[in-house]
Amino acid sequence: AAPCFCSGKPGRGDLWILRGTCPGGYGYTSNCYKWPNICCYPH
């Protein structure tokens, strides 16, 4: 996944293209929506 950044969060997240939700199984704990993609934290 491409790197992405959410304001107020340390480090970087994974950018998932054209997704409205973060996929399970990666240990993501938070996310921010960047239409039409989503940024899932932590990387």
UniProtKB/Swiss-Prot annotation:
Keyword Disulfide bond attributed: yes
GO cellular component, one term: nematocyst
Example GO BP: regulation of blood pressure
Highest taxon of the lineage: Eukaryota
Localization in the cell: Secreted; Nematocyst
Keywords assigned: Disulfide bond, Hypotensive agent, Ion channel impairing toxin, Nematocyst, Neurotoxin, Potassium channel impairing toxin, Secreted, Toxin, Voltage-gated potassium channel impairing toxin, Voltage-gated sodium channel impairing toxin
InterPro entries associated with the record: BDS_K_chnl_tox, Myo_ane_neurotoxin_sf
First-listed, main subcellular location of the protein, grouped into a coarse class: secreted
Transmembrane portions of the chain: none
GO molecular function, one term: potassium channel regulator activity
One Pfam family here: Defensin_4
Other noteworthy facts: Negative results: does not affect on Nav1.1/SCN1A and Nav1.6/SCN8A sodium channels. It has little or no functional effect on cardiac muscle, as well as on skeletal muscle myotubes, suggesting lack of functional interaction with Nav1.4/SCN4A or Nav1.5/SCN5A.
Family, similarity comment: Belongs to the sea anemone type 3 (BDS) potassium channel toxin family.
Role of this protein: Acts as a gating modifier on both Kv and Nav ion channels, and also acts on blood pressure. Voltage-dependently inhibits voltage-gated potassium channels Kv3 (Kv3.1/KCNC1, Kv3.2/KCNC2 and Kv3.4/KCNC4) and slows inactivation of the voltage-gated sodium channel Nav1.7/SCN9A. Inhibits all Kv3.1, Kv3.2 and Kv3.4 by about 50% when tested at a voltage of +40 mV (45%, 48% and 56%, respectively). May act by binding residues in voltage-sensing domains S3b and S4 of Kv3.
The protein's name in its UniProt record: Delta/kappa-actitoxin-Avd4a
